[in-house]
């Protein structure tokens, strides 16, 4: 195991020997640096971010954290568009705090990023990507998740305008 610091991020490198293989498995963990002072709690003795910090990170992953110019010159953010992030936000929105309420506490660039995501994400690609996930809820319906998230973003837009 080795450790280094890149900017404010911490990076951990692990090398794990694999039985009957000449090559070792190399794993790296990169710490996201979104918070100056994240709220850390312990779960079975393991330090983890608070649920609110995790929610914030999931929104930042979907919305993006850096702005760029789009085709017509507008400043927009673009996140990683992963189905897993959308699913996690869906669960957090239903179990912790509705997304439209949580978004009000976030900086404007993340709010704009989620609205931009809502306007451009491919519903078809999202449904197909969700099929690849091992979702624990056997009654899960991708269409219902997408409609729920769309309605949360619409409600947020309605409340801030």
Kindly give the residue locations of the regions a language model identified:
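Compositionally biased terminal segments of proteins
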Residues: 1-161
